[in-house]
Design a protein with these regions (language model features):
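Active-site loop/helix belt of alpha/beta enzymes
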Residues: 1-100, 154, 163, 189-191, ...
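Charged (often Lys/Glu-rich) extended helix/loop segments that serve as interaction or gating elements
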Residues: 65, 76-226
Length: 226
């Protein structure tokens, strides 16, 4: 046995759960040493948070407290960490479209081309509160149910979610989809996983075309002004 690993849970916004786990780990290290087993590795897992609109946290202060406790109680141990969501969570955004609209029980239902068996698996497994941002304007808001494309009654992501009224073909932006989405997505019922578009590549292809268009437009304006 080389060491001990723990995980405090995803999107942990306080150092307290880590400090509590470190107290337990310290006791286990001491018990192991008393039994003649020298542990040399401590894996503090993941759980480091990414920004969310309604969640406040001070990550530098969290890390300061964790590091101080590690220096105090585990100075001789090899420290591992698994910052999964923290590394890739904000690196990917999803664009999903409305493929069906109906009404049930007096409430609109919007069916998307991505569902619980795809990118939104985190709703079930991580209780992750995905944000839905509509490109459609308007001040009117309705409480709606959002479901995925499969025929499974489990494939429902959100109930009572406030949104502007939507139509088939409308697009929704879902930010921060880089963690535990495509990795756990399936092809259930024959639906393909969401395709990736690398923004830097698209930008490199589009910018020269846009630049040429701007030059031509400026030349036309200059000609018209003469």
């Amino acid at each position: 046995m080389a060491g001990i690993a723990f995980h405090v849970g995803s999107q942990t916004v306080s150092a307290d759960p880590y400090l509590h786990a470190l107290d337990i780990a310290r006791e286990l290290f001491e018990e192991a040493e008393a039994a003649g087993l020298k542990l040399r590795v401590l894996d503090i897992g993941g759980g480091f948070p990414i920004p969310e609109p309604k969640v406040k946290f001070n990550l530098p202060e969290m890390l300061r407290q964790i590091n101080a406790r590690l220096d105090e109680d585990f100075a001789d141990a090899e420290i591992w960490a698994e910052p999964g969501r923290y590394i890739c969570g904000t690196a990917v955004n999803l664009i999903t479209s409305v493929i069906g609209v109906t009404e049930r029980g007096g409430q609109p239902w919007y069916f998307l081309d991505e569902g619980l068996y795809g990118t939104f698996s985190g709703v079930l497994f991580d209780q992750w509160d995905f944000k839905l941002i509509s490109f459609r304007g308007g001040d009117e808001k309705v409480a709606a149910t959002f479901a995925g494309p499969s025929c499974d009654s489990l494939d429902i992501m959100f109930r009572g979610r406030l949104t502007v009224p939507l139509q088939v073909g409308d697009l929704l932006l879902v930010p921060s989809c880089g963690a535990y989405t495509s990795a756990s997505a399936t092809t259930f019922n024959g639906f393909s996983k969401a395709k990736f578009v690398i923004w830097e590549r698209v930008k490199a292809e589009v910018e020269p075309v846009v630049a040429v268009g701007r030059v031509e437009m400026n030349q036309s304006v200059a000609q018209a002004a003469k």
